[in-house]
């Protein structure tokens, strides 16, 4: 998965939903890791 970009307060949750895995947030960029 590529990174998801969001300014949402629930960035990690949105990233996990987008990617179907876990989300790690680094500033405004959320990196998705599939499990």
UniProtKB/Swiss-Prot annotation:
Role, per record: Toxin with unknown function in healthy organisms. On glioma cells, interacts with chloride channels (probably ClC-3/CLCN3) and MMP2 at the surface of glioma cells. This complex is then internalized via caveolae, thus inhibiting the chloride channels necessary for cell shrinkage and tumor propagation.
Tissue-wise expression: Expressed by the venom gland.
Cysteine pairings via disulfide bonds: 1-18, 4-25, 15-30, 19-32
Protein name (record): Peptide P2
Places the protein is found: Secreted
Cited Pfam families: Toxin_5
SUPFAM superfamilies given in the database record: Scorpion toxin-like (SSF57095)
Notes on the domains: The presence of a 'disulfide through disulfide knot' structurally defines this protein as a knottin.
Organism expressing this protein natively: Androctonus mauritanicus mauritanicus
Coiled coil: none
Lineage: Eukaryota, Metazoa, Ecdysozoa, Arthropoda, Chelicerata
GO-annotated cellular components: extracellular region
PROSITE patterns documented for this protein: SHORT_SCORPION_CHLORIDE (PS51200)
Keyword annotations: Chloride channel impairing toxin, Disulfide bond, Ion channel impairing toxin, Knottin, Secreted, Toxin, Voltage-gated chloride channel impairing toxin
Entry's family note: Belongs to the short scorpion toxin superfamily. Chloride channel inhibitor family.
Keyword Disulfide bond assigned: yes
Molecular-function annotations in GO: chloride channel regulator activity; toxin activity
